[in-house]
């Protein structure tokens, strides 16, 4: 024990007299380990604490406080009581000791065994004996005071409330004059606790407001590389929570807000309006009443006069909050309706008459103000719409110019579109005892609104028609505003526009509107629109080349109509009842295209497939649609494509369903639908697809008239043969959930492997490889997967090692897709496969193909190995791949022959181009020399990929560019005259981006760049000239005032 005491005395001596700061940590460790106690430490410090030298006393208190900061949780109540008494006494000591005393009290304030009454005692001592103001204490000491307050408010709230207004007065004195942003955040937290936790403000309400509001509005801007990470937004939100926390501040805050809204500083205006909006959530109409005219005047002025969207948006938000607050007021028989009074001020004295002016100059700011007010509550929407909508309807009917009518209709749309606050409360009718339908504020104008919308849809003005579709959509979203007759009229108008309107903007708006209405009123579209679209799609075809030539523009026009009809069918098909009617129409188009009876083009067939895929997306949310695709659509697609593949060439007609582009368009239809299937249907789909492709089982296909011996996975010489249907097998089995077991998996993989390695057709062997990859990616780890991988990779290696083999490209394609499948799931074997790929970069025959293969590895695949298809895709796999392999790539580049270096550069550009921007910036210093080398490569693909990677990175002005600017400018300017248009455009974008670097860095290159840009300014391609003009404009202004 004596030895421990000697150790402690030694530590104290070295710290106090020897100025060895590290001994504080040793002392803390001794206390934590039980070698000695805190009270023993106090005893050991006795001589130091009673020294006549303030510095010596300060070192003693400093040691004790540092130990307490580490060991406060182990103190007993008695020890805490003794220490608090000691520290309170020390607050009266020399000022050099005060900082250490405050740190000790900060530690003690966190103790869970704080004795009763000690919290009050601590605060009284601080308020009486410490001058917290900025002139007296340093930043860290003031921070200690605020942290003590926060800790005690958390643990001893009731004791502090017992201090009453004395606590508020003490805090006000402490925070007065604070300017450090770190401490302000703490002070605002204390003030917020005072307000929100019900402390008695007493007679110090105004003082508390004054001591916090003096910082409003916040104009703090953090210095560059601020280590504390405090933002202006943090301070703004913290102060706003204080100022708007109690209605007792209203009489002081609202005049201040009015004053600050008149400021010339935009940020002050915006902050003031946002603060006013926050007031509306906590104040009642009583606090607002006196100041409403002044607030309204300021808001109106800013919305009418500002050119800033931020100021306008903040003003409208503030107005909406005020109206919402007034709407919550309870009406008494002997009091006026404050909401009605305020809205009368808004409507009659300022805004309403602007809607009726002949030139409609101020219609938009007036409309925005009125819409913000009306959208704030149900009561406000009642008052606003009853006053405004009749005037708008009258104006619309009295105007003859389409532009004015469009403006009025757009304004009307803002009032028709409901906001969450303007809807009536669920189950509560705000209009006496009427039904739910009558609760809509627009019921009284239902017929007039429909008449205006249908009239606008009948106009010839495209802008008016587009706006009318938006108003119609808004009306349809509110129950009861469209009667059955109105819905039918709307469908008829929309159908007419789809069939007749050639303006692309109108067509798009009509199709979108049709989709919205069809979701709510499917029966009307099934009975009225779909039959007409079907008739137009399947009739009126021109059959022969001569007839097409003679028809000219008429033929082109009918094709455009059919495209609109097909797009509309997809848009309206979000409900099962519509899908069951629309999808057969699209299937009928595919059937007609296959048989050749109507002469549909490949482009039209692809458009039909795209529409089917858009419909299939709804299967994710609607099981009935998914089941319909499983039962009807997918078997029909498989049957049609199989018929087309088996069709004899002697028939004189080659079905467009054998076209690779069409098959590629069918793949997402099937994969989207299969990915959404429920487990039972998914298992059945897997069994049917595998039995079809392995055994030729066509029993589940409609119109089953196929030969008895079908072998779709058998490699064929005919590129349009059944083997290309492997893409549909992939769509069926590789998009199913991972929990679905694929039957005959090993047998299927063997046949797919044979097809991928022996087929002479790129389309067939690529999709066979993708199918293998999709299955391998989802297969559980274990012996079965290892056996498959061993077999596949052995065959791939044999083919690749045989340089005379005619199937090396096929083997490489299989390798790259299997490598991707394993990379995505972090399989251990993926490292060996990527090493194999790196070794192939120097292959004279495959090198360029392998380099492009890295694009496959790093890019998202749209048809397989993606999350939509339930693939096993781990996060950040690209970053991991880059981290593990970038050094191998650089080493390979350095050791490669000059003729083969371009393959490494191309691979590098593909990898870097697909990395997240943050990773690119981090790795740029190491990779920039190689990227510059890539710009000198003769391969235009390498150039374009590298430029695509560089351009977004240059916008971030990375420091790594400082030493490489000369080389970068030389290469980029040379590429502005490249033979490839895309390379010229990309290099000009990079040159443009370089103009945004710090002026002192790029100013020396200005004359050189402007001279080099003369050639692309005269380029024969318009898009190149456009990029050159943009770049030259920035470089020309460089160095000029305001440039």
From Swiss-Prot:
Disulfide bonds: none annotated. The keyword Repeat applies. Signal peptide: none annotated. This is MMS19 nucleotide excision repair protein homolog. It comes from the Eukaryota. One of its GO terms (biological process) is DNA repair. HEAT repeats lie at residues 879-917, 921-959, 962-1000, 1003-1041. The gene is mms19. SUPFAM superfamilies: ARM repeat. InterPro entries: ARM-like, ARM-type_fold, MMS19, MMS19_C, MMS19_N. It comes from Danio rerio (Zebrafish).
